Amino acid sequence: MSTNTRCPWVGKLPIYIDYHDKEWGKPQFDSQKLFEKICLEGQQAGLSWITVLKKREAYRAVSHQFDPAKIAQMTEQDIDHCMENTGLIRHRAKLEAIVKNAKAYLAMEKCGENFSDFVWSFVNHQPIINDVPDISVVPARTETSKAMSKALKKRGFVFVGETTCYAFMQSVGLVNDHTNNCCCK
């Protein structure tokens, strides 16, 4: 196997190659980083991931590096300012979702529920390494992502449908869907 072989969806953009090689499918256990990813996956709904990836630094800036306590304090006026920011996806419901999700995250913490433990419980705290001979076998959603979506919604999260949850699971390494010949498998 060539050390340069990557999943075919990566393409040639350096930002995408870097994301694929250093983040996608790598197990992430930090609760705040997991929170960032679930929020960003929600921003992707209906768009390509590269669109969100290119805007990630702008999201980090307006969300105080995805600090849930600071995000939860954001007001309608703050959202109005975000709507004027060309560095963000200017979709009010998606921007408001980040605030709602921060409040849901904090409510979980208040009840003694650790976000990382919660997320990883869906895969018994072990990454699932899938057999992926080619990307055509990778599902858009699974029973596990369906269960995660339902559990997140029950806790007050929004923009966390089954497909969004599966993309989240892939991105944070709950599942490894790198193709079998990928250098990152």
Language-model regions, residue ranges each:
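HhH-family (HhH-GPD) DNA N-glycosylase catalytic core used in base-excision repair
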Residues: 1-185
